[in-house]
């Protein structure tokens, strides 16, 4: 599996059931920035023009390098494990979220994500107000500020 953002054909995982699009596969099949993902729902496999949702998996000790979501909102629900976000200018602020927590990330906010555990995977549901998933994400140099 590539963790670089290489895209897979996601249409094989979704069924159009007459206006309700169903996804029943959530296994890890692709990745981006050291995070593994299931197929998810997006504009790639549904008619969505403004939403996407995926199940994300961060390996033990894993880090999603600093980045910015350009012009879209993100809401995350942590199913398993704990993540630490270092965020803001220079990623100098920090907050931890654990299983059962939900949180919102503002568009344009620099952040880097860390799995707090060296032994357990993090599992989370990630929702975006962008149907294109990863195309509107930019790397952020946390040492530049």
Regions found by a protein language model. Give the residues of each.
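Histidine-centered active-site/metal-ligand motif
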Residues: 67-69, 85, 111
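A short hydrophobic beta-strand segment most commonly corresponding to one strand
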Residues: 53-56, 75, 104, 119-136
């Amino acid at each position: 599996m590539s963790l670089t953002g290489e895209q897979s054909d996601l249409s094989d995982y979704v069924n159009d059931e007459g206006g309700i699009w169903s996804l029943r596969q959530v296994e890890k099949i692709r990745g981006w920035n050291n995070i593994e993902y299931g197929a998810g729902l997006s504009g790639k496999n549904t008619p969505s023009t403004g939403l996407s949702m995926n199940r994300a998996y961060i390996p033990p000790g894993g880090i999603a390098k600093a980045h910015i979501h350009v012009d879209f909102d993100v809401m995350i629900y942590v199913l398993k494990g704990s993540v630490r976000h270092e965020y803001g200018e220079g990623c100098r602020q920090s907050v931890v979220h654990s299983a059962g927590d939900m949180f919102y990330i503002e568009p344009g906010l620099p952040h880097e994500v860390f799995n707090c555990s060296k032994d357990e995977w993090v599992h989370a549901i990630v929702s975006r107000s962008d149907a294109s998933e990863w195309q509107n994400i930019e790397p952020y140099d946390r040492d530049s500020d």
